Amino acid sequence: MQHIHFDAIVIGSGPGGEGAAMGLVKQGKSVAVIERYNNVGGGCTHWGTIPSKALRHAVSRIIEFNQNPLYSDNSRVLRSSFAEILRRAEMVINQQTRMRQGFYERNGCRMFSGEATFIDDHRVSVRYADDNHDILSADKIIIATGSRPYCPPDVDFTHSRIYNSDSILKLDHEPRHVIIYGAGVIGCEYASIFRGLGVKVDLINTRNHLLAFLDQEMSDALSYHFWNSGIVIRHNEEYSKIEGVDDGVIVHLKSGKKVKADCLLYANGRTGNTDTLGLKNVGLEADSRGLLKVNKIYQTSNENIYAVGDVIGYPSLASAAYDQGRIAAQAMTKGNAEVHLIEDIPTGIYTIPEISSVGKTEQQLTAMKVPYEVGRAQFKHLARAQIAGMNVGSLKILFHRETKEILGIHCFGERAAEIIHIGQAIMEQKGESNTIEYFVNTTFNYPTMAEAYRVAALNGLNRLF
């Protein structure tokens, strides 16, 4: 057993941990990074963002091949199994892991692969797979342990046909019909993936419409697209029992309905990874969802301990977690942070087609009694979309009628998560620089999807009187 001292300890090597570790070493601090698994990257790289987006990309290309007359004359259909596209995802995961491992090595972070448990405010025990352990100490410690799928105790996740969003990546059979319980971001993304592979999908939503945090038009567009593709959405439903049987799974709903399929993906909620940290030893307590409370510089109620990423809840985005880590690193060394997380964080939802938004929704602006106007552009009217055969989609700009300040941008369609950043860049400008007129007065490359901003801006300004 070793006793080793560092300036800072980072628990977790996902986006939040990486942001914190890189921020600390750039300020000349000695840093230990503790990762419970053998590979760095956290849930984002191995079970969440990277694999699901790699799967989605592969499926969307299959759909494009089968629907585009340039590639297919409908005499044959390109098919691929879930296992085959998983192999592609594994290649991307391996590339990401090697790259991130290199970040830590080049920057002199000391890596420890084991389970971290607090001993006191400055000491952490690291227990390894062989049951040996070391004790690390530091002036400051940051928790970036992420989250895991919520698994209710009355659901038998040991059954071979019942999965959560982590274990679904080990799917070893070819389902013809899948039930997805939970219609949040993860549930909707996997509904797109499975339907794109030709699998029947029942999407059980515990709420009254999809992704309620989105602008209503974006939510409605996704609902229609799902319906048009053959996904069966069951709103306002909750299970009373989930029964694993020999040939699949039966979901008994409280409404009296029963749904049977070859397998079930349970995707309803996540839990912070805090239960094994020994938080009581440092005077901390997680809430019922395993989440920690922090202040604006990501400091917990223990002044020596900080927390970032999924383990603190909203916004639970990999991009935000990395920035939170950088901000916390600055606060840990200087006592405060000169930079803060931006107010309007873009959201990307990688369904097929994808959705992205930044800023306020129409519902929010109406409730706030803000005099706004709407500018719209349909992808089907853009030359680049026609060339690429990506006619499904639209861009919507919400702006103040009097000041012309951009208040929100919402995009539905292929490349939405890329397109959104053009508008975000203008929204982040201060004062008169944030104006919808920028898109009219600038020159766009032609033909491009970005040109949707000019079309939407003209459409919106023409509504003013």
Curated annotation (Swiss-Prot):
Q: What is its main location?
A: cytoplasm
Q: Name one GO molecular function term.
A: flavin adenine dinucleotide binding
Enzyme's top EC category: oxidoreductase
- What EC number(s) would the UniProt record show? 1.6.1.1
* GO biological process annotation, one example: 2-oxoglutarate metabolic process
Q: Which domain of life is it from?
A: Bacteria
Q: How is the cofactor bound?
A: Binds 1 FAD per subunit.
Q: Which key words are in the record?
A: Cytoplasm, FAD, Flavoprotein, NAD, NADP, Oxidoreductase
Q: Which HAMAP family match?
A: SthA
State the function annotated in the UniProt record: Conversion of NADPH, generated by peripheral catabolic pathways, to NADH, which can enter the respiratory chain for energy generation.
| Name of the protein this chain belongs to | Soluble pyridine nucleotide transhydrogenase
Q: Which organism is it from?
A: Photorhabdus laumondii subsp. laumondii (strain DSM 15139 / CIP 105565 / TT01)
Task: Write the lineage as a comma-separated list.
Answer: Bacteria, Pseudomonadati, Pseudomonadota, Gammaproteobacteria, Enterobacterales
